[in-house]
Regions:
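S-adenosylmethionine
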Residues: 4-470
Length: 470
């Protein structure tokens, strides 16, 4: 029998999505105006020079112009700019098809029009366009990645329509297959979560969760690493900057936290973080070692080490020993030869596993640069391995999805260094109660780990672990 309460509930279920869409439309109309188009044009023009990352250019723009925009307005502009960078060659192909009809329009202006349309819809931007721009937009039919795949699956233009350089596209397909590659590309266009690591030396995870929940955040605790919190896409974690300021939490991708776990840090060990950067993994290692032993954080950049020291000071850790080296032959490395229980090499790489956050990288990185990265990675891994004691462990990781930076480096290293053998990464993690979803299929037949963002909802990472036998 249909009660009054059930009737009200059913009506609510029907009306609620419509109501939400109306509110979203009102929100877009309220905050969008001509200055957004101009701002997007300014930012995208700089980005297309490919001298700096998308994120850093947006940050610099708002640093100067920030007083003119509220947080909601900045988010709208950021979303549009990222859409343009992610879809660059697809948008350019649409513009090219209409070239004869838009001879008086700049490509930059057209890119921004398409970017706004892709994120906010035609109805939002239409009132701010000239007649020729309206005619251009009226002839454009935006397609989803899946529909592009169906239409161009047998075309040489597929990678262009999907906005991926051909050499990257070919590499991904050779590693996985076309269908999985399409899924991966689609995931790089979607909104993504933010992961944080709780510093359990300062605060219990449950206490931090209460504090964050009281601040109105939507988040969940990772089922893999108990110190890891996953915030929903769009959450502004800067609203809890008080927790960051005192070192209670750090932004760190789940994949990055898994790398630290693959090292298996233990109390009183000596662990070398060979490419420490600003110290994200050094901090995680030091925490897991309960502030005992030594984490020797090595980097070639004094600027990065300065930032690392600041983070160490905030974290409360006393077991981090930062060292700046001039090059791989620096004499300061000699004293550590054959002493480390574990050595982590999170090698400098193309960063193509971070395309969700850094979409410009696919346009900035070249094939020749990949070759240079690969050669340098092998040199770094080889030198770092000399710091590992007999019976000690070596972990190699990148945030790249390119074969030449990952498996190829590992194969060359093992062929040149017969005193190192592979480890079973699956069992290493399972012994720490970290059981990765079997459907992710992250372990290859050699024991390497591949995290692909379409499956794991993390940045994409490659990891491998070895033991020094003699």
């Amino acid at each position: 029998m249909l009660t009054f309460q059930n009737l009200v509930f059913k009506v609510f279920i029907v009306i609620q999505p419509l109501k939400d869409n109306i509110f979203k439309l009102i929100y877009k109309i309220k905050y969008f105006n001509q200055k957004y188009i101009e701002s997007c044009c300014e930012i995208v023009e700089k980005i297309l020079e490919f001298k700096q990352s998308t994120g850093s250019l947006i940050f610099l723009y708002f640093k100067v112009q920030g007083k003119n925009f509220g947080s909601k307005e900045r988010k709208l502009i950021t979303d549009v700019v990222f859409s343009i960078v992610k879809n660059k060659s697809y948008f350019q192909s649409l513009i090219k098809e209409e070239q004869l009809n838009i001879s008086n329009l700049s490509e930059l202006r057209c890119l921004v029009i398409l970017g706004v349309t892709s994120k906010l819809g035609k109805e939002i931007i239409y009132p701010f366009l000239s007649n020729i721009e309206k005619n251009f937009l009226s002839r454009i039919e935006m397609k989803t990645i899946s529909s592009i795949y169906k239409e161009f699956s047998h075309s040489l233009l597929l990678n262009e329509k999907l906005s991926v350089p051909s050499w990257i596209f070919s590499d991904w397909i050779s590693q996985r297959n076309l269908k999985k590659t399409i899924n991966f590309i689609e995931s790089n266009h979607s909104d993504f979560p933010i992961y944080c690591r709780v510093n359990i030396l300062k605060r219990k995870v449950k206490d931090v969760m209460v504090k964050i929940r009281d601040s109105g955040f939507t988040f969940e605790r990772s089922g893999l690493i108990e110190e890891c919190l996953k915030f929903s896409p769009g959450e502004n974690v800067n609203r809890i900057k008080s927790l960051f300021a005192v070192g209670v939490i750090e932004i760190q991708d789940l994949g990055s936290q898994l790398i630290a776990k693959l090292v298996v840090p233990k109390r009183h060990q000596i662990i070398v973080d060979f490419c420490a950067g600003t110290g994200g993994k050094s901090l995680a290692l030091g925490m897991h070692m309960k502030n005992t032993g030594k984490v020797i954080s090595i980097d070639i950049s004094s600027e990065r080490i300065v930032k690392l020291k600041k983070r160490v000071s905030t974290s409360g850790l006393k077991n981090i020993w930062p060292i700046v080296i001039k090059n791989l032959e620096d004499e300061r490395l000699i004293k550590y030869f054959g002493t480390a229980d574990s050595v982590l090499v999170d090698a400098p790489c193309s960063g193509l596993g971070t395309l969700r956050r850094n979409p410009d990288l696919k346009w900035r990185v070249t094939e020749s640069e990949i070759t240079n990265f690969s050669k340098n990675q092998l040199k770094i891994l080889t030198k770092a391995s000399s710091l590992c004691k007999i019976g000690g462990y070596l972990v190699y990781a990148t945030c790249s999805t390119i074969y030449e930076e990952n498996e190829m480096v590992v194969e060359k290293f093992l062929s040149n260094n017969v005193n190192f053998d592979r480890c079973c990464t699956n069992s290493v993690l399972e012994k720490q109660n970290i059981v990765l979803d079997k459907s992710w299929n992250v372990f290859d037949s050699y024991g390497n780990i591949h995290l692909w963002s379409d499956l794991t909802d993390t940045d994409s990472f490659f990891m491998s672990r070895f033991i020094r036998t003699k």
